[in-house]
Structure formats: structure tokens, C-alpha cells
């Protein structure tokens, strides 16, 4: 009779579910899990902060289309709260935090990290949260947590594992680890809904498709390409769906949904919008009609019925797996060649997107420092299908978005619908773990404000030999909020938004990473090329101008950047 700990049961169950990495930060509460990982050769990516581990699990899940698992000691629930919020708010990472907690017997004893109801804390920011009350329940509940995380709409779950439950030993023959059995296809759309959607799409004169995170998580690029080729409908995306555009011909790529801002002024407002996993919110101009016209018929496909018509009226709502819906649309259109010729409409879309880009380029001049638009162009020139780009910060990702839709990255990860900065380093760290397995590199493009949240993770990169390239757009400020102060209360009321900082590349070098400081297009391009050539973690500290305001920031505060 062999006796095993609860921690051993956790790891055996995760292995049976296909988990290949664990992200976390050690604590005595979860040492049995760490010991079992050592015995079973499960790599642990141990970060310098629990929040980074939580975001890394998400980045790994999003970049690798796998399950991300984070484990941390009792206090970690407080540190990882934002990571749970980020996932629940729409990034849809497939993640399971496994926090340890004080022993059940120690409740109300004022001992180390005991008596805190982690399940109650996590309930509002997770899909499902539960505390394991008996060691023999671990395999069943771990598998239940995994099914909850992987089922649509995807999101974080939390399984609280008390110290004594993990330390307790039971006969290994007394428990059975169940198999993980999931549907391989997800919920397909009702045939009647599919027919109605295709009928509306056929009649439209200026239809567009807008992709969101659920498309990038669940759809095959080949199916999307087949559907688009058959119907001739140009495709846009929000930030989370951007990577799906990489598989489309240039003539069908409208870019980011923000490009639709100027279409109405050109008498080219879409008359039908097919939203495939895109959700109403900040990325669509809320319900303003600036991007998704009120006059347009909207077909919205999402696995979460709560998202259908959240901020604008829609003509048809379909609750279904987005990837499965795209497959069904591709199959249906492949059997019907009688679709309108939309060559002129696609050409108009391409022209308007190019006009926006040219307008931004023409206004992007800076006498005293490198313009962030020009810095973003340098990044774009070095990005291809072998690179995943992670964007963080406010001004940084807004400037970067103006160029990324013109190239074809292997992946593009951003804040998600929550929109909080500071998540990028952890997300990129996890993405680089997944990308190493796929033979890709990851580049984090972040602001000097946002990188400060996790700057200690350069140590993690060096220890774990992760060749992440961290590009810091350094304007020595919390740029977006500084601009807000200047515009809202006056330039003489700027306070608490300056970051007259030191050497970020020096910090990275002190941890053992490669460090570069650049201040021109030429020096930046050379440094990035060198960093990509070297298979090492690197930091490129890019001195950029503060004054330029990206178009989307002006739109958000009610101004017209193209007036």
C-alpha cells in the first residue's frame, strides 16, 4: 500500500489533463505540489511576484492555446486578484489558479495566512471557485475546475487547497483520477440562424466582419480564409482578434476596428457588421455608433448570451462557439458560388485604411525626440509570423496598434476588455514559454510606467533562459493621464504623472539580460535586429517623445484626430 500526499494527487491529475508547466511562487502551503512537480519533471516557472505568475499563466494559455495553471501560497490570492479580473473581463485565458491556504484546523487561530475565505474573495472575479475539504476529493475537483476553465465562455477558476489537505497522505489505490473528456467542437449555431445570417450578409452592400478574442482563441485561420474568400467581405478586428488577420490576403484586411471611425465621413459606413467574438465596449466606441454604425444591421456571435446586444441593438444574435460558427459559415458558403462581387467595396476599405495611416504618418514629426509612431514602425518591420507581440501601457499600445494591423505577427496579446496596464510583463513571460515550444520569439512593447509593475521579472527571464525582448517606450511619464491633465485642467496643473527615471536597460543588465539604450530610428532598428539574432532576454530602452497624442486617445476624450 503506497501512501501519497494531496500535492502528489494535484500534480498527477494535472499531468493526466495534459498540463506541461506550472507558474507560481513558492510557499510552505504548496510545497507538496512543488515536490511532486520535481518528482514528475513538471517545469515550474517561478516568478518574483504572484501577480506576474497569474498573468504568465494567462499569457501561456493565450499564446499556446493551452491550459495555464498558477500555484501560490496563502497570500497569493491578494496579489493575483487583478489577474483573475483580467481573465474574467474578456481575455478568456484558460487558467486555473491553485492557491494554497492555511490549514482548515487553524481557522480563527490568528496563525499564518489562515482563516481567510479565498473562495468568497474569488467568487466575483472567477467563473467558478471552490475549496477542497478532503484529500480524496482532489482529482475530481481539479478535473471539474479544468472543465469549467475550458468551457465557453472561457475564464478563470480558482481551487483553494488548504495546507492540511495537501499534506495529508492517503492510499493511492483508494482514489481514481478521472479522464478529461471535453467536446472537441463546442456548440454549433442553429441552422436557421445560420441561414438568416447568410441571407442578411448576401443582401448587404457594404458588409464587414469584426473579429474578437473568441475568434482568435477558437477559430482556424484556414476556415476564416475560406469564408472570406467565398463572400468577399473585408475583415476588421479588435486588439484581441488582430492575429487572425494574418491569414488573410491584403485586399481583405481592413485592420483594427478603429479604422472604421472615418468611414461615415466618406459615405462608406458599413450597412452590416458581422461580429465574430467581438464584444461591445471600449474597443467599439461603446454604443456611440462611431465605429459600429447605428444604421447597420448587426449579427453578433458569442458563446455568452449576456454579450449579445450589450450596448447596441442587433438584428441577429447567435449563442455558439465562434470557431465552430466560422467553420459552419465556411462550409455553407463553399457550396454556394452566387455571392455578389464586392471588389469595389474591398478596394474602398483598403483606400480608407491607407488614408488614415498616411494622415497619421504625415502628422508624426518631433523635433526633440523619437516619435512613438516612428518607433512603432521600427518594431513592425521586424515582426513576422515567427513573433508574438504583447502590448502594454496606454500610449504605447495605442501607437503600436496603428502599425500592427499592417503586418502579420504570429500573435498579438493586449490588455483585454479590462484595459488595465501593468499586465504585460507577466503575460509576455508566459507567452514566451509557449512560443519556445512553437519555435517563436515574443516581444513585449510596454511603457515606462507599466514596466515598473514587474521589472523584477528580468530576473525570472535570466534564471529560466527565456529570450523575451522587452521594448520600453520611455517618455518619462504616465503619458495618457498626463495628457488628460493637460487637456482637462490645464498644462499648469500637471501633477503626479512625471517619471523622470533612471536606466531601465541598466536594471535589466544588472539581472543578467542584454541592455540597450536607443534614441533614433537607426539605433533602435540595429538594437532590435541584434536582440532578435541573440537567443537571450533583452531590454531595449527607447527614448520617445511625450507630446504626441495617439488618435484613439483623442477620440476617447471626444476630439477628432483627423479634423
Swiss-Prot record:
This is Benzaldehyde lyase. Belongs to the TPP enzyme family. PANTHER family: 2-HYDROXYACYL-COA LYASE 2, THIAMINE PYROPHOSPHATE ENZYMES. Its cofactor is a metal cation; thiamine diphosphate. Its EC number is 4.1.2.38. One of its GO terms (cellular component) is acetolactate synthase complex. Binds 1 metal ion per subunit. Binds 1 thiamine pyrophosphate per subunit. Keywords: Lyase, Thiamine pyrophosphate. It comes from Pseudomonas fluorescens. One of its GO terms (biological process) is isoleucine biosynthetic process. It catalyses: benzoin = 2 benzaldehyde. It comes from the Bacteria. GO terms for molecular function: acetolactate synthase activity; benzoin aldolase activity; flavin adenine dinucleotide binding; magnesium ion binding; thiamine pyrophosphate binding. It holds the Pfam family TPP_enzyme_M. Cleavage of benzoin-anisoin acyloin linkage.
